[in-house]
Amino acid sequence: MKKIGVFGGTFDPIHIGHIYIAYEAYKILELDEVIFMPAGNPPHKKWKDITDEIIRYEMVKKAIEPYSFFSINNYEIEKKGLSFTYETLRYLHESFKEVELYFITGADCLVNLNSWKNINEIFKFSNLVVFNRPGFDKNNLLKRKEEFDREYCTNIVYLDLLNIEISSTLIRERVRQSLEVKFFLPPGVVDIIDKYNLYRRE
């Protein structure tokens, strides 16, 4: 059965940390493909503060061009209204039929997992893959993983990756201060930031 990773996010902007996480998940889990899913209108973020979805889609598409095993899906962008993870995974499950989905997310999401809508459907349609992030204690995360594994009769995959302390927030702030960012970004993304004059008035 084909194994497909699903990596969602606002990607505002996408940076080399995102590419590293997706690549490591692809290799470690022996996935056939990783789908990047730029968020449309995420329920947990202030929509007015997020770059236009079409531009974010363009940045992700450009960033993953060199990788044949990465692809992009515009379901959440095309979908009207709020974007919930369980709906996205249900859509992919129904679209691909005979596949095993792996939903890739960060440690912060594991900590707040009980606040997610229809969490049982997330486990029904996918394997949850959690990667560590700076500022989160590994032992506490593994304890939470065990608690959720028992509560939902599942087996969350924990990826102990290098902590790359790069964030989209940091990049936006550096652009606002007219500092160099090209070494944080995949080729071509900085050109799109310049093209649309992004992040210079936050």
Curated annotation (Swiss-Prot):
Reaction(s) this enzyme catalyzes, per UniProt: nicotinate beta-D-ribonucleotide + ATP + H(+) = deamido-NAD(+) + diphosphate
PANTHER family according to UniProt: NICOTINATE-NUCLEOTIDE ADENYLYLTRANSFERASE-RELATED, PHOSPHOPANTETHEINE ADENYLYLTRANSFERASE
NCBIfam families linked to this entry: cyt_tran_rel, nicotinate (nicotinamide) nucleotide adenylyltransferase, PRK00071.1-3
Protein name: Probable nicotinate-nucleotide adenylyltransferase
Functional note: Catalyzes the reversible adenylation of nicotinate mononucleotide (NaMN) to nicotinic acid adenine dinucleotide (NaAD).
CDD domains: NMNAT
Gene3D superfamilies given in the database record: HUPs
GO biological process, one term: NAD biosynthetic process
Source organism (scientific name): Clostridium perfringens (strain SM101 / Type A)
Pathway the protein takes part in: Cofactor biosynthesis; NAD(+) biosynthesis; deamido-NAD(+) from nicotinate D-ribonucleotide: step 1/1
GO molecular function term, any single one: ATP binding
InterPro entries in alphabetical order: Cyt_trans-like, NadD/NMNAT, Rossmann-like_a/b/a_fold
